[in-house]
Amino acid sequence: MIEQRIARLRAFLQEHDADGVIIVQPENLRYFSAFTGGEGALVIGLDQAVLWTDSRYTEQAANQSGTWYDIKNHHNALSSSIRSSLNDMEIGVAGYEENFLTHFMYENISDGALCGFLPCDLTSLRAVKEPYELKATRKASNIADRAFADLLPYIKPGVTE
């Protein structure tokens, strides 16, 4: 599952003339890595991938994402760690989540980075649902339907919520 997502992401990058991407948006972080920790960033190149997090989450990251990513502790220096990965991977053009990466973080990453930057929107890659996602959505919908059906007898005019 994650392997196919990373492959689709890399194909997306090549279509957009980029050879790497920085991912910090929690939804994309989870989608492309399975990492559910509270803090982290992905730097994905065409043949390497790093998940940066802090010491609170390194074990969790290794358990959830260690198969696909090199897990690293950023030691409270996330921006410089991301920049280091971009330079180490020799990325020429890095995509970044324009609507999520803060200007402050962008400035800190780009200062000293040896690559160019390209804003990109990765939501289209999450739009096509996989079979397990459809199954989970159906299950959630059924739970919501049952909860609403259980609530209906109590909803009457004049009844306080």
Regions found by a protein language model. Give the residues of each.
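Structural motif
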Residues: 24-26, 53-55, 76, 96-101
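Terminal domain-start leader segments
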Residues: 1-52, 79-90, 108-112, 131, ...
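Flexible, acidic/His-enriched mid-domain "rim/lid" segments that flank
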Residues: 77-161
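Short, surface-exposed linear patches
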Residues: 43-46, 64-66, 72-76, 115-119, ...
